[in-house]
Design a protein with these regions (language model features):
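Long alpha-helical rod scaffolds of large eukaryotic non-enzymatic complex subunits
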Residues: 1-270
């Protein structure tokens, strides 16, 4: 069952690793010689580079081992998602899949912190722990690697209507927006917002931009308009744009759709 798989993957694994006596303290001692608690590089000394390289190798060994152990669970989740895109809708299935995956990333985040005693916060410094784990490609999602989630979503949305793409990115931005009160701002909520922001900025917003570009090319740039459509007819229901040139109408529709799917800062920059 799902609950049994979860218990083995996280609860039992945590028990096994924390019962390893001196293993974790030794691992953490090495990591702390290279990074602070938030994964930022410590003040450089003659041997800092050696410890950073050793820590990076341990990160890789740990995450690739987790990836191997969770391979069947990862494949099962993906298959269920693909089934739901057909039995429900691609938008509903994607929402469910994102929520489920964020929970798994959060659990992996917690395990990683307990093993290495650091919480690698997002940072663009090439010397940060975050960048070290981001470079570790796995089939499963982990704190530095959301690419498998993005790839699965994009694969499902590739053949979907543009509106479905917009519904997904719009929901993701709204669902994981800033909490309205401190009571709602739990550690998991903060982490989920971080995952959502990274997923949007690094993957889904560029994907959506490309989807709009393709639609503009198809319905505007390369569209053929019959001569009859060039005639200006009467205004309908008092709407000034109702008798506009067809391509102008379509352009306005696309702008409105983009505006609804994107946060204000991004739609204004367009």
């Amino acid at each position: 069952s799902d609950s049994t798989r979860h218990a083995l993957a996280y609860g039992r694994f945590e028990e096994m690793i924390t019962d390893s006596y001196s293993l974790l303290p030794n691992i953490q001692q090495v990591v702390h010689r290279a990074y602070d608690h938030y994964g930022q590089p410590v003040e450089s000394t003659s041997d800092t580079g050696v410890y950073a390289n050793t820590a990076s190798n341990m990160f890789r060994a740990y995450l690739t081992t987790r990836d191997r152990d969770l391979k069947l669970m990862t494949q099962h989740d993906l298959e269920e998602y693909q089934k739901e895109t057909k039995s429900l809708s691609v938008v509903t299935a994607t929402r469910n899949f994102v929520k489920q995956t964020f929970e798994k990333v959060y659990n992996e985040d917690g395990l990683f912190s307990k093993v290495f005693d650091i919480e690698p916060m997002w940072h663009n410094s090439p010397d940060s722990a975050f960048q070290a784990i981001k470079a570790i490609n796995t089939t499963m999602v982990h704190p530095g690697n959301l690419a498998p989630l993005a790839s699965s979503i994009q694969s499902s949305l590739q053949a979907a209507e543009l509106q479905a793409v917009c519904d997904v990115v719009g929901w993701l931005a709204n669902e994981y927006s800033v909490a309205e009160s401190d009571e709602e701002d739990s550690p998991s909520s903060r982490k989920h917002r971080e995952y959502a922001a990274r997923l949007l900025v690094e993957n889904l917003w560029p994907f959506t931009d490309n989807a709009f570009t393709a639609e503009i090319t198809k319905s505007i740039s390369r569209a053929s308009v019959p001569d009859s459509a060039l005639k200006i007819g009467p205004v309908e229901n008092g709407v000034a744009s109702s008798n506009a040139y067809p391509l102008v109408k379509r352009a306005v529709e696309l702008l409105a759709t983009f505006d609804q799917a994107m946060p204000k800062e991004r739609s204004v920059s367009l």
